[in-house]
C-alpha cells in the first residue's frame, strides 16, 4: 500500500533559518535497486590524460581505497599536478569529505612526488576557495573539491583544479519516484548541487524518451553556472505558467531554499539520494519578507554603518564593497570597514557605536540568521534598495542572483526593475 502524505507540523518559532515544513510524498519502494550504478561520469579530459597514468596498476589499486560511487578524479589530478610541475599542493574540501583527505594526500604524495597540505578551515562553497592562504603556505597548486568553478581559474594567485566529486546514485529509483508523483507530460524544473549534475542530465534524457510516461525535465540555468546547478545564493527565476513543480536532488534544504525564495509560487520537492525519500517542502516567504523589511527600515535611520568584507576564501568582493562605501558616504553616512572570515552575532554585538551592518560575504547570512543579530545585517541588494539604487522586492519575488553574471557577488550592479 502506498504511504499517505504526512504533513510535518510547522514550527511556531523560527530558531534556525526559515525551515518551514515538509510532507512526504509517494515513493516506489517496490522498485528499489539495491546498488547504485558504479559507472564513473568521465569528461572529455580523460582523452588528454596519458595512458601511463590511466593504466598505472598501483595508482588504480590505491584509488580503490576511496568509495566507488564518489568520483575524486584522481587520474586527472595526478596529470594536472605533474603537468604544472607543482611541488607543494593544497587540498581544500568541505567537512563531509575530510574523512578521505588523508587517503588522497597519500596517493598524491606517492604518485606525484609532491608535498601536500590539507586545509582544515571550513569550506561552505566555491566562493570559499582559499588560494590566498594556500599561497601563504608556499603552495603552488590547490585542488578544490565538491564545488563548481565559481571563481575563474585565471584570476587566482596560484594554479587551481576544481574537482566536482560527482556522485553516482540509484537513478532508476529517482525516475520511478518522479513518474509515480507527476502526470504524464509534466514540465518539471530539476536541479541540484554540482555533485548530482550528471544524474540530472541522465534522467532528463531517460524520462523524455520514456514511451510509457513521458516527462519533460528542464535543468534551469543561471549564467555562468551549469545547467541544473543551484547555489544557496543563486538560482534561476522560473516561469510559473510553464513549470508544474521544482525538484531538488540533494541532501539538506539550503540550496533548495534559494529556488524557493526566488520562485515562491511554484511547488517545491526534494529527493534525498541517500535516504531515497521524496518530500514536499515549504518555506515561510511572508515571514522572511517581513523580517527583511524591518531590518531595512531600521537601517535606513543609521548614522554609522559597519561595512563587512567576508574574508573566508574569496567570499567577499572588494568592488561591491567599494561601491557601497561610495554610495553610503555620498548620503552622509559614516562607514566603518570591517574584515571578518566568519560573521557571528556575538562578535558584531561588540561594535556598540555602530547602528547597522552591511555584509559583503553571503546573502544567506542575513536572510537565514538576520533575526539573531541585535542590529540590522543587510545584504548588498538590501543596502542598494535602502539607498534607492535598486528595485525593492515583493511577496512573490525576492531575487536570488548573487553570483549570476551581473550579480553583486561579481562586483556588478544588477537591474531588477524589469523583473519586480
Swiss-Prot record:
Does the record carry Nucleotidyltransferase as a key word? no
Q: Does the keyword Cytoplasm apply?
A: yes
InterPro entries from the UniProt entry: DPH1/DPH2, DPH1/DPH2_1, DPH1/DPH2_2, DPH1/DPH2_3, DPH1/DPH2_euk_archaea
Q: Which UniProt keywords apply?
A: Cytoplasm, Iron, Iron-sulfur, Metal-binding, S-adenosyl-L-methionine, Transferase
**Cofactor(s) for this protein?**
[4Fe-4S] cluster
Q: In which pathway does it act?
A: Protein modification; peptidyl-diphthamide biosynthesis
Binding of [4Fe-4S] cluster: at which residues?
127, 233, 362
The EC number on file is 2.5.1.108
Can you say where in the cell this protein is located? Cytoplasm
Record-linked Gene3D superfamilies: Diphthamide synthesis DPH1/DPH2 domain 1 (3.40.50.11840), Diphthamide synthesis DPH1/DPH2 domain 2 (3.40.50.11850), Diphthamide synthesis DPH1/DPH2 domain 3 (3.40.50.11860)
Which protein family is named in the record?
Belongs to the DPH1/DPH2 family. DPH1 subfamily.
What functional role does this protein have? Catalyzes the first step of diphthamide biosynthesis, a post-translational modification of histidine which occurs in elongation factor 2. DPH1 and DPH2 transfer a 3-amino-3-carboxypropyl (ACP) group from S-adenosyl-L-methionine (SAM) to a histidine residue, the reaction is assisted by a reduction system comprising DPH3 and a NADH-dependent reductase, predominantly CBR1.
Protein name listed in UniProt: 2-(3-amino-3-carboxypropyl)histidine synthase subunit 1
What organism is listed for this UniProt entry? Debaryomyces hansenii (strain ATCC 36239 / CBS 767 / BCRC 21394 / JCM 1990 / NBRC 0083 / IGC 2968)
**Gene encoding this polypeptide?**
DPH1
Amino acid at each position: 500500500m502506498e504511504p499517505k502524505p504526512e504533513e510535518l507540523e510547522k514550527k511556531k518559532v523560527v530558531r534556525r533559518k526559515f525551515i518551514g515544513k515538509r510532507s512526504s510524498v509517494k515513493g516506489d519502494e517496490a522498485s528499489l535497486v539495491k546498488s547504485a550504478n558504479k559507472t564513473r561520469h568521465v569528461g572529455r579530459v580523460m582523452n588528454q590524460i596519458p595512458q601511463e597514468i590511466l593504466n598505472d596498476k598501483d595508482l588504480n589499486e590505491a584509488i580503490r581505497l576511496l568509495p566507488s560511487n564518489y568520483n575524486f578524479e584522481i587520474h586527472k589530478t595526478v596529470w594536472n599536478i605533474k603537468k604544472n610541475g607543482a611541488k607543494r599542493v593544497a587540498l581544500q574540501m568541505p567537512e563531509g569529505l575530510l574523512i578521505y583527505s588523508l587517503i588522497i594526500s597519500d596517493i598524491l604524495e606517492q604518485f606525484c612526488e609532491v608535498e601536500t597540505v590539507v586545509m582544515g578551515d571550513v569550506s561552505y562553497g566555491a566562493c570559499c576557495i582559499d588560494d590566498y592562504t594556500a599561497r601563504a603556505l608556499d603552495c603552488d597548486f590547490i585542488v578544490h573539491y565538491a564545488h563548481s568553478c565559481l571563481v575563474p581559474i585565471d584570476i587566482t594567485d596560484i594554479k587551481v583544479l576544481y574537482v566536482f566529486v560527482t556522485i553516482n546514485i540509484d537513478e532508476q529509483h529517482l525516475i520511478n519516484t518522479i513518474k509515480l508523483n507527476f502526470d504524464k507530460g509534466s514540465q518539471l524544473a530539476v536541479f541540484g548541487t554540482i555533485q548530482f549534475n550528471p544524474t540530472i542530465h541522465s534522467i532528463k534524457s531517460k524520462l523524455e524518451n520514456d514511451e510509457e510516461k513521458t516527462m519533460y525535465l528542464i535543468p534551469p540555468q543561471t549564467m555562468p553556472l551549469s545547467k541544473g546547478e543551484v547555489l544557496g545564493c543563486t538560482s534561476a527565476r522560473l516561469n510559473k505558467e510553464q513549470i508544474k513543480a521544482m525538484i531538488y536532488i540533494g541532501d539538506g534544504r539550503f540550496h533548495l531554499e534559494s529556488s524557493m525564495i526566488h520562485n515562491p509560487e511554484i511547488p517545491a520537492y526534494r529527493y534525498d539520494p541517500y535516504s531515497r525519500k521524496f518530500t514536499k517542502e515549504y518555506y515561510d516567504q511572508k515571514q522572511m519578507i517581513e523580517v527583511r523589511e524591518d531590518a531595512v527600515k531600521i537601517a535606513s535611520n543609521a548614522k554609522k554603518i559597519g561595512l563587512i568584507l567576508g574574508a573566508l576564501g574569496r567570499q567577499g568582493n572588494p568592488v561591491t564593497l567599494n561601491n557601497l562605501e561610495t554610495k553610503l558616504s555620498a548620503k552622509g553616512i559614516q562607514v566603518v570597514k570591517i574584515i571578518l572570515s566568519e560573521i557571528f552575532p556575538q562578535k558584531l554585538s561588540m561594535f556598540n557605536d555602530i547602528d547597522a551592518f552591511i555584509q559583503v560575504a553571503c546573502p544567506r547570512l542575513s536572510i537565514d540568521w538576520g533575526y539573531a543579530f541585535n542590529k540590522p545585517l543587510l545584504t548588498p541588494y538590501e543596502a542598494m534598495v535602502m539607498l534607492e539604487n535598486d528595485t525593492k522586492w515583493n511577496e512573490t519575488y525576492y531575487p536570488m542572483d548573487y553570483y549570476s553574471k551581473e550579480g553583486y557577488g561579481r562586483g556588478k550592479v544588477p537591474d531588477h526593475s524589469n523583473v519586480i
